[in-house]
Regions:
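Structural recognition of the beta-strand scaffold that forms the well-ordered cores
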Residues: 66, 91-94, 119-122, 196, ...
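Hydrophobic, small-residue-rich alpha-helical packing segments that form membrane-like cores
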Residues: 97-219
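Active-site neighborhoods of metal-dependent hydrolases
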Residues: 123-124, 128, 132-143, 147-170, ...
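Divalent metal-coordination and catalytic microenvironments
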Residues: 16, 31, 36, 57, ...
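Histidine-rich, glycine-flanked metal-binding segment
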Residues: 4-12, 18-63
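Metal-associated gating/positioning segment near the N- to mid-region
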Residues: 47, 52-115, 179
Length: 322
């Protein structure tokens, strides 16, 4: 038999349960680290290290990826992002729900200059691009405007965007046709991107929205992530049985679609989600003009009340936390 040659490492993490992210079952092993790299996994009980970490009773895994954040609002103020790192999250993605920085290359440079701690990825937001080309108008783009939007998606992808995000529930994404989204998704797909969507509706029209999301993936040939899948409104609870069946059927016929969800029975968004989309058409100035009209304000108020009772408001104003 050969004598064991003792090795020395910077760090050895021992006695932990390893979950490696591959989908395989956990297993017990030691991990050796030199510099910033894992160099060996196995029984390292005879080896030495400058630092030993005993992971007895703990799980050792790669850093978690948070696929849906709005960390952009605070990343430059708190670049270490301890709230994520202390939970094991080492990669954050932004640009979700159709809103993103643009141009993307300028944003990445700002991130590098700030030296933020986690890994960072950006989706290019459909709503951001639409706003820059069309504004908050409720209409289709002209052929020239659509080409301009496609060029902007291509530019973002060439500068490192992960794909295209939409927030079809929010203005101005809500004013976009399915075909518009398909055309832009085709551009992202050419560059290896994915499509991630806050769908058009997650309440009474949930099933229509799931079908639309699947259709976008099929027509544009792009992998699809159906983000924070949920069923809003008590009367709609149970619809997830149908929505999940649709996703399973789409996957069975070859559509690359996945979903994520958050593990609590609440949602959070901006308060303008309670304001009807037609009232937001044309931008903030136009919305304020409508609110100044007593008749229109009364109509808006009625719709806000309905949304609180049957949609985003959780059924009762007591369930809203501002």
């Amino acid at each position: 038999s050969h004598a064991y040659s003792q090795n020395s490492y910077d760090i050895i993490i021992s006695n932990g349960r390893i979950i490696d992210g591959s989908g395989n079952p956990w297993y017990e092993a030691d991990i050796a680290i030199n510099g910033e790299h894992i160099v060996r996994i196995g029984d390292l009980s005879l080896d030495t290290a400058n630092q030993f970490i005993d992971a007895e009773g703990l799980t050792v895994s790669p850093g978690f990826i948070d696929p849906h954040t709005h960390a952009l609002r605070g990343i430059f103020d708190v670049p270490n992002v301890e709230s994520s790192l202390l939970q094991g999250v080492t990669t954050l993605t932004e640009g979700n729900d159709g809103t993103s920085p643009f141009p993307v290359d300028e944003h990445f440079q700002a991130i590098l200059d700030k030296q933020i701690s986690p890994n960072w990825g950006i989706f290019v937001g459909h709503g951001t691009i639409r706003s820059q080309v069309i504004g908050k108008e409720d209409r289709d783009p002209t052929p020239g405007e659509l080409e301009q939007m496609k060029d902007m998606v291509q530019q973002a992808m060439q500068h490192g965007a992960l794909g295209l995000s939409t927030g079809l529930f929010y203005v101005p994404g809500s004013f976009a046709s399915t075909e518009e989204v398909i055309e832009l998704s085709k551009v992202a797909a050419k560059h290896g991107g994915i499509y991630i969507s806050h769908m058009r509706e997650e309440a009474a029209q949930l099933i229509d929205s799931v079908n639309e999301t699947i259709h976008i993936g099929e027509e544009s040939g792009i992998p699809v992530q159906m983000t924070h899948h949920k069923v809003i409104g008590v009367k709609n609870w149970g619809s997830s049985v149908e929505s999940l069946r649709l996703v399973d059927e789409a996957r069975a016929r070859g559509v690359d679609i996945t979903i994520d969800q958050y593990p609590y029975t609440a949602s959070q968004t901006s308060i303008n989600a309670l304001i009807p989309q037609w009232a937001q058409e044309g931008g903030r100035g136009r919305m304020l003009e409508r609110i100044e009209s007593p008749e229109i304000r009364a109509t808006i108020k009625r719709e806000v009340v309905l949304k609180i009772l049957y949609d985003r408001g959780g059924g009762d104003p007591k369930n809203i936390f501002i």
